[in-house]
């Protein structure tokens, strides 16, 4: 761009170099570094070819300074999980462009309790402790920097910082043709394809479209199996657990052996989350939601925590599978040592599925007849094998989250952070139908 009577040429080089990975010195301010022309030779040559006049005039000033980046290039702001009273506003890459909005939102957050705008994409709690790993930071920030002017297509999966965490059945699912994406720190199934298939990213429908279409039809007309390790799970216990849940959630709490959809609101009545509550009937409750919101939800839960209430993130302990489709009841009825097939819609309970002790909910994000079957991490491989072997005679096939997301949209199941944000009220999303207006005080 023009810079007074000259031209300013900016470069994001592929051969980037990290600096101060342990943190910048406290006395560092606006200092510049010695130029390293050899490192940007390819990029500057392209610039000279694009603007031939630059080849004749020479370089007046070299500017080599530090940039601050997060793994996805967005700022890191807000209250830091696990550190009460500690706030941050870091990784503001474009200070002049973003600084005003970051400052405004942070001030509103501190004074009013929440920012006016939806700032989840900049919230420090969009990451978990896995992102504190220096190698993860090095890979992901380097990837973002080097791709600053590279087209990233919808649903394109990038390699940096992964694979990091995998469900126990990962290898068996890979052998079955699973193509993987990443959800927070976890590898999740996107779809299942023939050996050798490679997706070509596109601004239109990619060459994986027909594969995902087949998976949708399979679940609609028959039966499908989905790894739901990519759901979050929180356990709530204690003598005041029910009272606490009744305050934190706007819905009516489920009776023992039942589950319920539960909107969670901010003090101003805006949507804080859409989750499911399970009452297992033994004094323990589960909250289930989106896996990538684990730190975000836990921060809110701990902000509201009360005496006599314990809450635990089960994300490292539990995983599971979802059976969905009109034939799912036939399969599960032949495997359970209980009346799991008689569970009413939104019912839940503890059942033995083959050799595996499970916690089952009769619901499905796909919108079809379905069962969410939760198990301990150590039972994941065995549970998959049991379900596939028994489901074979019914034509069972595995499917991925691309199909699940498509089916939930067709069913009009919107979710927080995708279709809905913290700028929405329950009335704007249709979730007001789950609010219990007659119960006592709630947030």
What are these regions (language model features)?
Residues 4-6, 72-74, 83-84, 368-370, ...:
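Active-site lining segments that contact anionic ligands and/or coordinate catalytic metals
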Residues 1, 76, 274-276:
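Short, surface-exposed charged micro-motifs
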Residues 117-443:
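Glycine/proline-enriched, intrinsically flexible loops and inter-domain linkers
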Residues 8, 76, 85-88, 286, ...:
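General beta-strand recognition
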Residues 1-14:
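Glycine-rich, aromatic-lined ligand/substrate-binding cores of catalytic
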Residues 11-12, 20-21, 420:
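Short conserved micro-motifs at the rims of enzyme active sites and ligand-binding pockets
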Residues 4, 18-19, 25-165:
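C-terminal catalytic lobe of FAD-dependent flavoproteins
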């Amino acid at each position: 761009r023009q810079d007074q009577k000259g031209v300013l040429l900016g470069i994001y080089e592929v051969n980037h170099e990290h600096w101060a990975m342990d943190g910048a010195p406290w006395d560092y301010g606006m200092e510049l570094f010695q130029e390293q022309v050899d490192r940007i030779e390819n990029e500057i040559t392209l610039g000279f070819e694009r603007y031939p006049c630059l080849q004749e005039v020479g370089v007046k000033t070299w500017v080599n300074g530090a940039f601050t980046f997060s793994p996805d290039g967005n700022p890191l702001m807000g209250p830091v999980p696990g550190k009460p009273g500690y706030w941050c506003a870091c990784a503001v890459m474009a200070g002049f462009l973003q600084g005003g909005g970051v400052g405004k939102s942070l001030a509103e957050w501190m004074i009013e309790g929440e920012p006016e705008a939806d700032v989840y994409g900049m919230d420090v709690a969009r990451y978990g402790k896995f992102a504190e790993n220096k190698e993860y930071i090095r890979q992901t920030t380097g990837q973002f920097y080097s791709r600053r002017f590279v087209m990233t297509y919808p649903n394109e999966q990038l390699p940096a910082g992964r694979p990091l965490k995998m469900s126990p059945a990962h290898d068996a699912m890979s052998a079955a043709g699973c193509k993987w994406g990443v959800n927070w720190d976890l590898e999740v199934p996107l779809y299942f394809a023939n050996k050798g298939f490679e997706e070509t990213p596109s601004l239109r429908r990619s060459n994986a479209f027909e594969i995902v279409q087949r998976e949708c039809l399979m679940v609609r007309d028959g039966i499908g199996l989905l790894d739901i390790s990519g759901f979050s799970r929180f356990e709530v216990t204690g003598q005041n657990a029910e009272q606490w849940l009744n305050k934190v959630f706007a819905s009516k709490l489920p009776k023992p052996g039942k589950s319920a959809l539960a909107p969670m609101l901010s003090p101003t009545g805006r949507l804080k989350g859409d989750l499911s509550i399970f009452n297992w009937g033994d004094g323990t409750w589960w909250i289930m939601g989106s896996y990538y919101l684990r730190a975000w939800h836990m921060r809110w839960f701990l902000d509201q925590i009360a005496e006599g209430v314990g809450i635990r993130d089960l994300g490292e302990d539990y995983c599971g599978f979802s059976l969905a489709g009109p034939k799912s009841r036939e399969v599960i009825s032949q495997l359970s040592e209980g009346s799991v097939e008689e569970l009413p819609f939104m019912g839940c309970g503890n059942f033995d599925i083959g050799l595996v002790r499970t916690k089952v909910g009769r619901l499905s994000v796909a919108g079809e007849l379905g069962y969410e079957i939760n198990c301990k991490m150590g039972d994941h491989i065995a549970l998959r094998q049991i379900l596939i072997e028994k489901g074979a005679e019914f034509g069972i096939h595995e499917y991925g989250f691309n199909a699940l997301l498509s089916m939930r949209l067709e069913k009009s199941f919107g979710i927080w952070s995708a279709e809905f944000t913290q700028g929405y009220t329950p009335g704007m999303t249709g979730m007001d139908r789950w609010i219990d207006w007659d119960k006592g005080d709630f947030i």
